[in-house]
């Protein structure tokens, strides 16, 4: 295990891949919710469904972070989550990290709502929030996100496992 923090570009690529994987997980979770509760209209139990999807997302991340420190996207991009000492992340710390990670979105969305932002401003304010949050790693001496610093976790690079050459067929 290396202690080098992954570059921002690698983290953002991992997040993009993670969002595609999470789309499938949340699609199934939403389908289960609407099927089991016989949801016939999109607004029926809307807030309960939103809470359900936030909980499913949290369960997804917390499970992977506490069982090896990597989601599939993190494995693909050779990134691992560890605590500040390099050890495995306990469940309470993974939950804290998940909740703090919402700071990527909530301040920008809250500000946009408070300002009564419409159309393009509704997208611009949260996008600026995301940009500021991402580039803030350059203010951290260990190049960690703010939510990692607050949760006592770190993202580190892992060395890719070398592929073994296919065993040569031996003549008999």
Question: Which residues make up each language-model segment?
Answer:
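Hydrophobic alpha-helical transmembrane segments
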Residues: 1-5, 40-51, 67-79
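Juxtamembrane cytosolic face of transmembrane helices
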Residues: 2-15, 19, 60-74, 88, ...
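Hydrophobic, lipid-facing residues on alpha-helical transmembrane segments of integral membrane proteins
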Residues: 12-28, 32, 47, 51, ...
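Membrane-helix interface segments in multi-pass membrane proteins
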Residues: 26-54, 108-130, 138
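A structural micro-motif at secondary-structure boundaries
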Residues: 82-94
